[in-house]
Structure formats: structure tokens, C-alpha cells
Amino acid sequence: MANLKEIRDRIVSVKNTRKITEAMRLVAAAKVRRAQEQVLRSRPFADRLARVLENIQSRMKFEAADSPLLKARAVQKVTLLAVTGDRGLCGGYNTNVIKRTEQRYGELSSQGFEIDLVLIGRKAITYFQNRSSQYKIRASFQDLEQVPTSKDAEEATSEVLSEFLSESTDRVEIIYTKFISLVSCDPVVQTLLPLDPQGIAKEDDEIFRITTKGSRFVIEKDPAPANEEPVLPSDVVFEQSPDQLLNSLLPLYLQNQLLRALQEAAASELASRMTAMNNASDNAKELAKTLNLTYNKARQAAITQEILEVVGGASV
């Protein structure tokens, strides 16, 4: 059994570690709040843009639109856009995205497609660069804002748009972590390009907020408030042709979709870090209890031994 000083030193070390993990949990919680505020600030533009496109869609058929972003072509080359974080200590967040990327890469390779990677986040970059003989990396981005901004999305959007328009790739898929709850964040695969020729699919949207219950953080999600007021009157006449409008608006729409994916991935990373640090704090608390019990037993044994020695010496 370790001596009393070693046990006492380890108890102090565990308690100090718990203070660090608890502080990291609180910092992650504050950043989740910032992510929430960023989503709310970007929502008006995103909603208005989607509704403008819906208005244009109602006046024409997207199938007849002469926009390269809507044209599906025979797929020979596929670009996978993988989104991870720059840092660790967030549970299996980065590992799950990397595994899903490798899985998707294998699925497409088995079908005979030529594949390249566009990587966002230092963890994905480091992992795949160390395996550069197996994977082709076209571009990489790191040191993004902890709460992604439109500038972050613009750089990645410009890269994949350039690839798609130059026909260097025939399809772009994004792999990121979809935020569900503090304990459930799943990596998903979605097609970014080409855009759906049937029009803009309006998915149910939600606003998430972080609250506290019983001294613990929880995530609550509410449906985004609906606003059905028409953006454009039915008698509005566009000076530009629908094709010109689409070619101007669709890149903005694509950038907005990528921004929302980055924001959701950031929220997932922060939630994973909160959970990981919370688990670490709980484990440190239990370990400190166990060490205290061990220390008390060792101290009691030492005292008992001293008493026995004193009694034994007195009897002699």
C-alpha cells in the first residue's frame, strides 16, 4: 500500500484536476450560449433568403433553370467536406466524424468513384495528412472562430464552388455532427452540390438554448417562430431574368447552408466537451472519495501499528 504522503499528494492532485475540468465545463457552457446568440443573429438573413428563393421558385420551374449549381451530371468524382474541431477533450466528437468520413470514403471507393477531401478542423487535417498515401486532400481550413462566422463559411464555400463549377468534382457531400442534445450528437452525411433541382426543401427549424436544472446544464429546443408574410408581392416584376437571379442567390444560399452546418457542428463540439468535462469532474469526485477512504484506512492501520508497538514494548 502506498504511504500516507503519496496518497495525500494524489488526493490534492485529483482535487486540483477536478477544479480544472469544472472550469472547462463552465467555459464550454458559456460558449454554447454564444453559439445560440450567433444562430439567432444570422437567422433573419437566412430566413429571408430562403423565402425569396421560394417566391422565385413559385414563378418558374427549377428544372428549366439554366444554373450550373442545379445541374446533376454523371458522377465520377466526389468531394467529401469533413468538419471537425481544432482541439480535443470533447469525448468522441472528432473521432466519430473521422470514422464516418473513412466509412463514406470506403463506400464511394468501392463504387469506383474518384474521391478527394476538403477538411475543416485541425483534428481531421492531422489525421488524414498522416495518411496522405491513402487519401487525397484538396484543401484544408483550420483556426476557425469558435463560433463560426459567415467569413469562415465563405472560404470553404468558395473552394467547393470552384471545384464544382470547373467540373473538378461532380458532387460535394458534407460530413458534420448534427446537434441533437447534450448527450446525443450524431455525424451525418448531406449533399451540398448539386442543389436539389426540385427546389428548396424547407426543413423544420429549431432554436436551442442552454438552461440549468438542479445545478446541471441542459439543452432545450423550441420550434423557430413561423413568419408566413410574403416576401415579395405577386405583381413584382424582376428586371433580371430568373436565371440571373438564381445564379446570384444560389451561392449565397449554399454559403448559408454551410454556415448553419458549421454552427451546428460547433454547438455539438461544445456540448460534447461539456459532457466530457462533466464526466471527468464526476470521476474525479469519486476518485477523491476512494482515495480519502484509502488514506483513512492507511492512517488507521499506521496508528494501530504504533499502538501495538508501544504496548509490546511496555510488556517487555
UniProtKB/Swiss-Prot annotation:
<comment type="subunit">
    <text>F-type ATPases have 2 components, CF(1) - the catalytic core - and CF(0) - the membrane proton channel. CF(1) has five subunits: alpha(3), beta(3), gamma(1), delta(1), epsilon(1). CF(0) has three main subunits: a, b and c.</text>
</comment>
<keyword id="KW-0472">Membrane</keyword>
<dbReference type="InterPro" id="IPR000131">
    <property type="entry name" value="ATP_synth_F1_gsu"/>
</dbReference>
<dbReference type="GO" id="GO:0046933">
    <property type="term" value="F:proton-transporting ATP synthase activity, rotational mechanism"/>
</dbReference>
<keyword id="KW-0139">CF(1)</keyword>
<keyword id="KW-0793">Thylakoid</keyword>
<keyword id="KW-0066">ATP synthesis</keyword>
<comment type="similarity">
    <text>Belongs to the ATPase gamma chain family.</text>
</comment>
<keyword id="KW-0406">Ion transport</keyword>
<dbReference type="Pfam" id="PF00231">
    <property type="entry name" value="ATP-synt"/>
</dbReference>
<dbReference type="GO" id="GO:0031676">
    <property type="term" value="C:plasma membrane-derived thylakoid membrane"/>
</dbReference>
<keyword id="KW-0375">Hydrogen ion transport</keyword>
<dbReference type="InterPro" id="IPR035968">
    <property type="entry name" value="ATP_synth_F1_ATPase_gsu"/>
</dbReference>
<comment type="function">
    <text>Produces ATP from ADP in the presence of a proton gradient across the membrane. The gamma chain is believed to be important in regulating ATPase activity and the flow of protons through the CF(0) complex.</text>
</comment>
<dbReference type="GO" id="GO:0045259">
    <property type="term" value="C:proton-transporting ATP synthase complex"/>
</dbReference>
<keyword id="KW-0813">Transport</keyword>
<protein>
    <recommendedName>
        <fullName>ATP synthase gamma chain</fullName>
    </recommendedName>
</protein>
<dbReference type="GO" id="GO:0005524">
    <property type="term" value="F:ATP binding"/>
</dbReference>
